[in-house]
């Protein structure tokens, strides 16, 4: 099913709703590929074991014609169905078969491709057949086979019907449900007239021409007035964030659903789609003002474009026709929204919460879960969907953020002079509590930095215990984690603000020592743990870095491309900092100036860590 059979509806609807159209019959081609037709044949005709059909079978094993393994191709205006064939004609005598015919080979059925009388289906009508030699030439076989085919071939193979009624009806219902109340009449008129006008076959696909009557629209008067966009109010920004969160929730739900039928290798692509969407969401919220477009609509379109290729692959893997049909209808409905994007408000369609729910229900119709549920809890299924392991150990309970600087120093002064030893595989809980209640100053570095180094050693040790990363890369990974923590925060989890201890936070909302964004990583990590537990924050950062090192740096062969094993650390950090698709940013000539600078600064720190000078992080203070 590489070519979704309703994908071209997006073009149809886009043409129909374009401004200044006259009333006319608009025709648009739609393609059905052989995967989809074969799945329908397996569902309706070849229903026996191993996709087989048995004709004139007397149950003795001595008389039958078996057809199996249907394959479809199209050329020259016709469809050609090939099957494996096995024929026996004889009688059972004394537990054995006395056979007049015992034949095995291939059969090919030539079929006309026609529009059904309901104008919402196409027909594959069998007009002739032949037996084939292994080289594809016509074979001579007994007339018995021809007689049986004439007499016993089922109606569903003589005339196979491919119905468009269900997806067209679903599409009409979906668009009617998300249309503006002021545009319902025009939308209903156009979609209600949708029928199949003609069909042709060739090039491996059946091309169906859909047609629809388009109502005329008025001519615009003059040029549209160009007006400056007014600044958004706080309430408008809150509503925008709600809509953006709905798009995020929709794709999170969809990605989890799609992953259940996907191959493990698809998890990397699913992660890229979700991470790119969430990074764009964060960028929109950083600068929500002055956007003339609809950010929620743009966010949907960009994410949809990334998801569709994965949907196509997963659709091919569906085990039955109904689920394949569901995927194709889902893709078609989403593509219609995609096509309507450039028309904006004139189309009378918006990417609303209700519309996203309706779209999700096309793919998963019987799920009781709200597709737009937007929770902050760790979601084990989402972690699995994106190629991560089990959730991290829970964070340590956090204390009130307020503190008095003098009393704080007094409480812990003695411990700073007598720091406790910490083994790589064991962390003293008292040390963790101290770090989680400490806003270090420049004079504290002789004590603070060795303690954080112990935390990072422990985190690396724990991360490597899962044996996801082979031993030859362990040192590089350790240096990577230390250098990334240095680059991101100078090993700091907290800063002082208005006499309170608060998590270190960037302008884009990244938090803690590893600068992890809660909106980007929602559902994969405990958000409170990221804020208030330095160990949990470090674990999350190491978890992400290892994932990127395995799936991008090593998976893409960066060390082989450059001939340097340290490129694995540079690649993993580029993906960590810029998103998975930036895994090769550190060596790309076309990388942004900012990206080049960030990668150069990281590599400088990495080399210092590699040479045993990780405590040079003190220069930050």
PLM features: what roles do these ranges have?
Residues 498-522, 575:
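Short, surface-exposed glycine/acidic/tryptophan-bearing loops
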Residues 26-27, 95-100, 111, 128-139, ...:
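Second-shell loop/turn segments in exported
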Residues 1-9:
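Bacterial N-terminal signal peptides that target proteins for export
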Residues 23-400, 405:
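Extracellular/lumenal and peripheral-membrane lipid-interaction modules
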Residues 422-496, 555, 559-560:
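Export/targeting segments at the very N-terminus of extracytoplasmic proteins
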Residues 42-46, 50, 154, 158, ...:
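Sec-exported extracytoplasmic/periplasmic mature domains
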Residues 18-19:
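N-terminal signal peptide c-region/cleavage motif recognized by signal peptidases
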Residues 392-434, 438-449, 519-621:
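Non-catalytic cell-wall polysaccharide-engagement segments
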